[in-house]
Each structure stands twice: as C-alpha cells, then as structure tokens.
A protein has these predicted regions:
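Cyclophilin-like peptidyl-prolyl cis-trans isomerases
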Residues: 2, 18-203
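Bacterial N-terminal signal peptides
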Residues: 5-16
C-alpha cells in the first residue's frame, strides 16, 4: 500500500513539474482577416481591431457594406520595393461614409513598416474610404510629436498585409501616367488602375 502511494505521489509531482514548465498559451489574436481580391491577385490583410479600434471599425464597415467592391488601386509612389500604393473610394459620394476620428501612431503603437495599411487623409479627422499600403519602412509617415509646428499627427495605421506583398509590389511597379493627377499626385497615377473586385472577411 505504501509503495502504491509512493508511486502515485511521484506521478503527481512529475505532472505538477510538467505543468510548471509548460509556457502559457498565447492569447488568441483579435485581428480580423480581410481578402482584397484584385485584378492583380489576392492581398490578405490582418485588421488590428484592438490597437486601432476606430480606424479598423471604419475599414470593416466599408468591407461589410461592399463599398470597396469595384474600387481601384489608382496611385503608386516610389520604387518597386519602397513606397506605397493607394486605393479605395476616391471620395465617391455614393461610397464614402462620414469622416472618422484620427488615431495617431503614438496612440495605437502601430508604425508604417513593411506591409502596413494606413488611411489617406487631408487634415486629421478627414479620413473616409481611401487607404494605402506601405512597402519598406516609412517612419516619416508616423506621428511626429516633437515637430512643433504644422500637421504632426501622421497617418493612421490599422492593418498589415499577411499574404500578397508580391501583388502590392506588382501594383507599385506598374506604369504611371505622365499627365494624370493634380499637384503632387501628377505622375503618380497608374496608367491602368487595378480593380479591387471584392473585399471580404475571411476565416
């Protein structure tokens, strides 16, 4: 009997030691995945609803209401592996929703690193349904609180590409129109914009 108890005690101690050595399971991700199916291929993104709740909710509203279906990637700035591509509603009054509150990178902790999605805007708080995808690292687009004058709020990152950066690079490398666009955007508009066929949540 004593021997049986000793064996059970040893087994329990071994089990307890194993539990103590087992690292805790990582917290489940709260990111929402969205597939942008374009004429150039699929771009799969993870939308950070926990870190950028206002901006993420706005983007997902466009997705759920199918407001991105049939829109375009229309702008490409930079080289083939550094810069950004821009797409979305293009201020189409039939597509855009009211502007949202600006969430700077100093608030969200997100940055304009490779594959980041961020909202296009004019003044802070004017973003609606246009966004851009970053290739490479572009810290100048982050909030710059040390900048004493002017707009130092940067752009609002809310998601990252998890698959399909080759598609993003192909869009950026596509030929640009020498005449389309106004002001700083002249020469940055794609000669043949890439259609976003659908934008859908995926598992």
């Amino acid at each position: 009997m004593i021997r049986v108890l000793a064996i059970l005690l040893a087994a329990l101690l071994g089990f307890s030691a194993a539990l103590a050595q087992t690292p805790p399971a990582p917290a489940p991700s709260t990111d929402v995945r969205v597939a942008l199916d374009t004429d150039a291929g699929r771009i799969l993104i993870a939308v950070h609803v926990d870190k950028a709740p206002v901006t993420a909710a706005n983007f997902l509203k466009y997705v759920d209401q199918k407001r991105f279906d049939g829109t375009l990637f229309y702008r490409g700035v930079g080289a083939s592996d550094y810069g950004f591509v821009q797409g979305g509603a293009q201020n189409d009054p039939k597509r855009i929703l009211p502007p949202i509150k600006h969430e700077p990178t100093t608030q969200t902790g997100l940055t304009h690193d490779d594959g980041a999605l961020s909202m296009a805007r004019y003044a802070p708080g004017s973003a609606t349904g246009d966004f851009f995808i970053v290739l490479g690292k572009m810290p100048a687009m982050d909030a710059q609180p040390q900048q004493a004058s002017g707009d130092n709020q940067g752009f609002a990152v809310f998601a990252h590409v998890v698959e399909g950066m080759d598609v993003v690079k192909a869009i950026l490398a596509a030929p640009k129109s020498p005449t389309a666009g106004e002001g700083v955007m002249k020469g940055q508009m794609l000669a043949a914009p890439v259609t976003i066929r659908t934008a859908r949540r995926v598992p």
